[in-house]
Regions:
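C-terminal catalytic/acceptor-binding lobe
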Residues: 2-37, 44-52, 61-71, 213-335
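Conserved donor nucleotide-binding strand/loop of the catalytic core
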Residues: 105-121
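Active-site nucleotide-sugar/metal-binding loop of Leloir-type enzymes
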Residues: 118, 127-137
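Active-site acidic Asp-centered loop
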Residues: 87, 134, 141-143
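Short beta-strand/loop segment that forms part of the nucleotide-sugar
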Residues: 55, 78-94, 116
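Conserved catalytic core of nucleotide-sugar-dependent glycosyltransferases
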Residues: 130, 141, 145-225, 229, ...
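Short, acidic, metal-binding catalytic loop of nucleotide-sugar glycosyltransferases
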Residues: 68-81
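Short, charged/polar "capping" segments at the starts of alpha-helices
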Residues: 61-64, 89-99, 176-177
Length: 335
């Protein structure tokens, strides 16, 4: 009788802990009141040696890629935890259950992993403060960008030296069209003012600034993001630049692959639906919409806080001289 009771007790504990862990990590839609200032931890008390990775997920076609990306991040010792924010409300529960199990099973590192089913598809949700985040730095990234571990760790080292700046590997710029007399979204060859959320590292404070401060003005700009279904990254750059009066920092990466870039040709993409799932795959319309966002944010704020930065921080410059080897011009230090 005692043995049977003990077996039942062990089985009960297994079920409770297994199911509790699964439900918590898969159904949690965020803190009930993310803007409760009493729950905000003091910056100095947060961990400075690691970063929390927050990945935005939506497309079911990208789930295999998402699993690979999570596994890659989890393998780095600087990653404290990984939060996958799932914003597609139509995804079946069974598929999300399987996704969560795969994330746990195939991620080799010690980082804790949570799959958080969002209550809405609002892009603003990726910047909500979360009480579970215990690091000073957070990395906001997409589900279609792979970056190597050394580049991740280098970006973190750059951020630690510049904790008030936005740091990233993908950049764009604002500009003023003299002919049209309006602000536009563009790319400049020698300067930039916007870091994209493909890979954006920042201090946790900016989540609270974006989601909870700024009064009616900030609320109106978040509504613009919802209406356009775009531009949350541009608005975060507005927030950081307005507070800091400085532009972002671009860092170089040894190997980074953007599977959602529309310039991927079909032969290079395992499934073209992986490439086409993103909003930004429709390039011309995408750029026009983002230009409109910049103009709308400028209208609401009554000023243009975005500031230009120049150059890129790289891990090493290496050999710059070219030599002819095997009939090809290559850097001289290459075999």
């Amino acid at each position: 009788m005692g043995v049977t009771r003990n077996r039942f007790y062990i089985w009960f504990l297994f079920v409770v802990f297994f199911v509790t862990d699964l439900v918590f990590c898969r159904t949690l839609s965020g803190d009930p009141d993310p803007c409760d200032s009493t729950k905000q931890r003091e910056f100095q008390k947060l961990r400075s040696d690691q970063v929390t990775v927050i990945i935005n997920g939506y497309s079911e076609y990208r789930i295999p890629l998402l699993q690979t990306i999570v596994a890659s991040y989890s393998s780095s010792s600087i990653v404290s935890s990984i939060l996958v924010l799932w914003g597609n409300p139509s995804t079946p529960d069974q598929l999300l259950d399987q996704l969560y199990q795969n994330l746990i099973q195939y991620s080799p590192g010690s980082a804790s992993i949570s799959l958080i089913q969002q209550s809405s598809s609002s892009l603003n949700a990726r910047f909500l403060p979360r009480s579970s985040v215990d690091t000073r730095a957070v990395l906001i990234c997409d589900d279609d960008v792979e970056i190597d571990r050394r580049s991740l760790e280098f970006a973190f080292s750059v951020w630690k030296s510049n904790p008030d700046r936005l740091v990233g590997t993908f950049v764009r710029s604002h500009g003023f069209d003299l002919q049209g007399k309006e602000w536009i979204y563009t790319v400049h060859p020698d300067k930039y003012s916007i870091v994209l959320t493909k890979f954006m590292m920042m201090k946790q404070d900016y989540l609270f600034e974006y989601s909870c401060k700024g009064g009616a003005e900030m609320e109106e700009m978040r509504m613009i993001v919802d209406r356009m279904r775009n531009c949350e990254d541009i608005l975060m750059n507005f927030v950081a630049a307005d507070r800091l009066r400085a532009g972002p920092i671009m860092v170089g990466a040894e190997r980074v692959r953007d599977w959602g870039d529309a310039r991927n040709v079909e032969e290079q993409v395992v499934d073209e639906r992986v490439r086409d799932a993103g909003l930004s795959s429709r390039r011309v319309e995408h750029r026009k919409r983002r230009g409109k966002c910049i103009r709308e944010f400028h209208r609401v704020m009554g000023k243009m806080p975005l500031m230009y930065s120049y150059g890129k921080v790289v891990n090493s410059v290496g050999e710059q001289g070219l030599c002819r080897k095997a009939g090809k011009l290559v850097f001289c230090d290459r075999d």
